[in-house]
Design a protein with these regions (language model features):
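Extracellular/lumenal glycan-associated surfaces
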Residues: 180-181, 260
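Structural signature of tandem-repeat unit edges
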Residues: 1-12, 22-35, 45-58, 68-81, ...
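Consensus positions within tandem repeat domains that build extended binding/scaffold surfaces
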Residues: 14-19, 37-42, 60-65, 83-86, ...
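Extracytoplasmic soluble-region selector
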Residues: 233-298
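A generic local structural motif
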Residues: 195-198, 284
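Intrinsically disordered, low-complexity regions of eukaryotic proteins
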Residues: 5, 14, 51, 74-76, ...
Length: 298
């Protein structure tokens, strides 16, 4: 089998449905498909062209693992979660577009994607789980979404071409081996919000420089570990909010995010409500509707 095009009547694709179909080059899933099992296309080593349903919300576990000929893919605008190992071992993958709806990237999602050179995570992304980009040996350019609060264990381990990275302003923790064996990493910008960095986060501290805010935890960490530190003060030129108008029911909550330009701006984001009897907002931008009316969140 080299090509599969489904009729619109298909609503469910089961586990391992096409696993090991090594001659399959093209597959088109209709918009009628609502769910996918795990390992659906695992080991389809000739697969080059995929069309996914427009309304899918979840890219399933190990869906494209070891699809070694897959070079590019567009993820539908409705997808909220890319499950663990979804593209692990896709050694030819060099372009992927991620939607503004995306919330979570699972464990080892892009592990071993050795041709992936750059990727942009949307600001809607809240979590990038451990090992997500492990051994992406060609990765040189990655933009992380502003909603991310933790760089989890081994997220960028073995990204041997990565020379610099800017961590978003809300990142609080950098976990064990987050940048282990990043042999070319020379510059990392760490925000004021960061309050915890593992002693094993970096393999070559003597070769790198941390850029951050004077007096921050990042500076303390740099001094403790004999890492060069450069204090910087960069003004925000533009702020982009995830929503400009929002309607919430009583007691309903919504997480608002602010994208800063330039990304390494050192200005602090402070949230406030024009009327806390109608809507409250905490220091992270989490809004809670209290009663009927209108309030301006700034």
């Amino acid at each position: 089998i080299k090509e599969i095009v489904f009729p619109d009547s298909v609503v469910d694709v089961q586990d391992y449905a096409f696993a090991g179909c090594r001659s399959l080059k093209k597959i088109v899933f209709p918009d009628s498909v609502k769910s996918f099992g795990k390992d659906v296309l695992c080991g389809c080593t000739s697969l080059k062209e995929v069309q996914l349903p427009k309304n899918m919300e979840w890219l399933s576990y190990s869906m494209f693992v070891n699809c070694t000929s897959l070079e590019e893919i567009d993820i539908p605008d409705s997808v909220k979660v890319i499950d663990s190992c979804a593209f692990e071992g896709c050694t030819s993958l060099n372009r992927i577009s991620l939607p503004q709806s995306l919330k979570t990237i699972g464990v080892s999602t892009f592990r071993g994607c050795t041709s992936l050179e750059k990727i942009k995570l949307p600001d809607s992304t809240k979590q990038v789980q451990g090992n997500a980009f492990e051994n992406c040996e060609a990765l040189t350019d990655i933009k992380l979404g502003v909603g991310i609060k933790s760089i989890e264990s081994k997220t960028f381990q073995g990204c041997s071409s990565l020379e610099f990275i800017i961590l978003p302003y809300q990142v609080e923790t950098i976990e064990d081996n987050a940048f282990k064996n990043c042999t070319k990493l020379r510059k990392i910008t760490i925000p004021k919000a960061t309050t915890s960095i593992s002693d094993s986060a970096f393999s070559y501290p003597d070769k790198m420089t941390i850029y951050g805010v004077a007096g921050s935890y990042a500076e303390q960490y740099a001094k403790k570990n004999d890492i060069a530190f450069v204090a910087q003060q960069i003004a925000t030129e533009k702020i982009t909010l995830s929503e400009t108008e929002l309607t919430l029911g009583r007691n309903e909550k919504y997480q608002l995010t602010a994208g800063l330009n330039p990304m390494d701006s050192t200005d602090e984001v402070i949230w406030s409500s024009s009327d806390e009897k109608i809507a409250k907002v905490d220091k992270t931008g989490n809004i809670e509707a209290i009663s009927a009316g209108e309030a301006v969140i700034t």
